[in-house]
Structures are given as C-alpha cells and as structure tokens.
C-alpha cells in the first residue's frame, strides 16, 4: 500500500487584489472567469488550473511561486 500525500495550497490572491484596489468581479472579468471562481480561489476552496495560475501571476506582475504556496501533509 502506498502512502497518501495531500497538499493544501495557500495563496496571496486576495492580498494582491485588494492592494491593487480591485473587486473580485473586476479580477474575474480580467481573468475570464466568474466572481465565484475568484472567491473560491481566495478562500482556498478551489485550486486554479496551471494556465489560470499563470494568468493571475502575469496580471499582478509576479510569479506563480510568489502567489501560490503548497503545504504538504
């Protein structure tokens, strides 16, 4: 039997969005997703796809690694 690894991803999306004075709706529109998707990412209920994570990072002028942090359990 193998060992099961779980991973929780924390992120800085809310902090970056708020420091840029953007609403969830504005960021969602820029990313081509729903406001609910942005809310779910910010609260950790949804881990974005790699293309969306890259798009968010580029939008804020930073790297995926600076925004998303994996906690391995």
Where are these regions (language model features)?
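A short, Lys/Arg-rich alpha-helix, primarily the initiator
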Residues: 1-19
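Residue-level signal for the short linker/turn that defines the boundary of a DNA-recognition helix
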Residues: 11, 21-22, 48-51
